[in-house]
């Protein structure tokens, strides 16, 4: 019997037609994140888990190293439920630490490397962390923290720890550091647990595994508590998605572990699928391009900044790729067409796949997939995810194609913000269906085929006055999507500033093609704006910028652009 179409996405769930019955009916795993990757790799112990600058670590070695780390943590007094703060990149040691803590039921609290010493101290205190682990590259901050918090146990990591010996020697010669201080070296730390015996802590539903933080582009960063169930739900759903993931595939990971995406997609997903995770730490675009050429990954995930650099550089052959996907900022349709055209010219048979998510849902709920792709959209929901578009004013569900706030009900939605029930209740709400839905603060729509389209942030809609003195809504994203069509514009971000006469006005920051006369290009873009935008949306000023500021989560940092505007104008 054919299912009746109601016209409401969350009831019809049209995206399920793309999935197998097995994917729809599959039970989600009930185990810790460590138990999950162990179960998935029982017959893959000789396979490569990590590839770090040519040092290839098998799954057998990988699990042994995790056990050593777990024993060392137990030796220094870390127990189930304890929190350990980590300021590091995705080195092998960092990954052992995350899963080693998970083995004994402790929680990895992942903080941004860019935080100041005082911010990290405040974080350690607020989370009641029992230990602090940090990279040698922030050693001065580390020493300041040790001085301020003399009772906390500290462990110093070096990015060269797992490099092949010849690279390690070269790195240490080039980066001589004063290693004096109270912190354990990783080697000495491991030695503490040599005679200790620990067992895996039994699985408890919704037990926390990691804490990651929102990027803070819309306010003070909040601690997002992700459980074992959340992270495993992402990996399990992707295993049923239409990606050609195979055990032994090379997955190039450039995403820092202090991002939700870095933990769920960068680290946990490839290990859960038995892939070889090629770890690359330097996110300077040209260095990423060089590494990409050398590694030749089958799967690669990044953001528009890196993607643009890759395509601007001379990468001739991309036939080896099966998945080329991205997150963070979105491309306009024009940019997406250009990217796909260039990719096809280089031998990649698919399309650049974009997705949608937020830190609060392990950074992913929707994604494009090979063969399931629609230009200008963010793909379809994962098989266990439901999406609802609601009217921001009355909370009523919108029909196909109608704009509203994007809401999700999913097994990968966080357990809550750390020690912040009020903010948790503001974003996760129980609807009349009795289910808990996360309210994203984003506007979008779902079409009859199940594809999600992003329209913009609710908070980034402003009021302005037109020349006729009428009040209009001002949408920065609308302006950006038009300006990027101009042949001289490479990147564009619009900020909105208060104005006594017009309430608010738009200011467009533009990275233009190199070598153009600034006055001429500014005038050309302004003329283009007047031709292609309604009068009230024409930017008051075009500000040319040599390089866009980006957050560590690969989003244009509009706060810095606002600061720059205030300082200069």
Positions of PLM-derived features:
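N-lobe entry segment of adenylate-forming
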Residues: 1-57, 61-76, 161-178, 197, ...
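Conserved ATP/PPi-binding loop(s) of AMP-dependent carboxylate-activating enzymes
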Residues: 380-384, 396-429, 457, 468-474
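Conserved adenylate-forming
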Residues: 73-79, 193-207, 211-253, 350
């Amino acid at each position: 019997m054919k299912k009746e179409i109601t016209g409401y996405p969350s009831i019809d769930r049209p995206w399920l037609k793309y999935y197998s019955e097995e994917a729809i009916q599959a039970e989600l795993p009930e185990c810790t994140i460590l138990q999950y990757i162990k179960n998935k790799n029982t017959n893959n112990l000789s396979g490569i888990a990590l590839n770090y600058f040519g040092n290839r670590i098998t799954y057998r070695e990988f699990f042994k190293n995790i056990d050593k780390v777990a024993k060392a943590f137990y030796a220094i007094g870390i127990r189930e439920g304890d929190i350990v703060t980590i300021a590091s990149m995705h080195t092998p040691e960092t990954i052992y630490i995350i899963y080693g803590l998970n083995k004994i039921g402790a929680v990895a609290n992942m903080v941004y490397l860019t935080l100041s010493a005082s911010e990290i101290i405040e974080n350690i205190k607020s989370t009641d962390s029992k230990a602090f682990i940090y990279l040698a590259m922030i050693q001065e901050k580390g020493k300041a923290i040790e001085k301020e918090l003399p009772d906390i146990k500290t462990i110093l990591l070096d990015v060269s720890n797992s490099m092949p010996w010849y690279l390690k020697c070269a790195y240490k010669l080039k980066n001589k550091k004063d290693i004096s201080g109270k912190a354990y070296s990783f080697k000495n730390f491991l030695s503490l647990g040599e005679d200790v015996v620990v067992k895996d802590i039994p699985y408890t539903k919704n037990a926390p595994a990691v804490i990651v933080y929102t990027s803070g582009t819309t306010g003070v960063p909040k601690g997002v508590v992700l459980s074992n169930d959340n992270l495993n739900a992402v990996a399990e759903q992707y295993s049923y998605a239409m990606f050609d993931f195979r055990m032994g595939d090379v997955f190039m990971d450039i995403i820092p572990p202090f991002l939700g995406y870095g933990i769920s997609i960068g680290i946990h997903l490839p290990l859960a699928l038995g892939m070889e995770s090629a770890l690359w730490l330097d996110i300077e675009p040209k260095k990423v391009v060089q590494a990409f050429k050398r590694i030749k990954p089958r799967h690669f995930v990044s953001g528009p900044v890196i993607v643009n650099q890759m395509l601007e550089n001379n990468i001739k052959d991309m036939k080896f790729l099966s998945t080329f996907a991205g997150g963070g900022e979105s491309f306009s349709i024009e940019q997406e067409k250009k990217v796909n055209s260039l990719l096809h010219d280089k031998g990649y048979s698919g399309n650049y796949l974009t997705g949608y998510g937020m830190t609060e849902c392990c950074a992913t709920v929707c994604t494009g997939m090979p063969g399931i792709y629609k230009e200008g959209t963010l793909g379809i929901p994962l098989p266990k995810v439901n999406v609802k578009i609601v009217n921001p004013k009355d909370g009523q569900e919108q029909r196909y194609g109608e704009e509203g706030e994007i809401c999700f009900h999913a097994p990968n939605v966080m357990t809550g913000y750390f020690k912040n029930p009020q903010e948790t209740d503001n974003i996760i709400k129980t609807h009349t269906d009795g289910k808990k839905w996360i309210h994203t603060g984003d506007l979008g729509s779902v079409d009859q085929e199940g594809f999600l389209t992003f329209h913009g942030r609710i908070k980034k809609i402003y009021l302005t006055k037109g020349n006729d003195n009428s009040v209009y809504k001002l949408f920065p994203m609308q302006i950006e999507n038009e300006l990027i069509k101009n042949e001289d514009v490479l990147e564009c971000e619009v900020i909105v500033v208060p104005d006594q006469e017009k309430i608010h006005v738009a200011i467009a920051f533009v990275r233009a093609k190199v070598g153009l006369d600034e006055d001429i290009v500014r005038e050309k873009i302004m003329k283009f704006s007047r031709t292609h935008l309604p009068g009230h949306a024409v930017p008051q000023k075009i500000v040319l910028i040599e390089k866009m500021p980006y957050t560590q989560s690969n989003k244009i940092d509009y706060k810095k652009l606002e600061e720059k505007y205030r300082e200069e104008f």
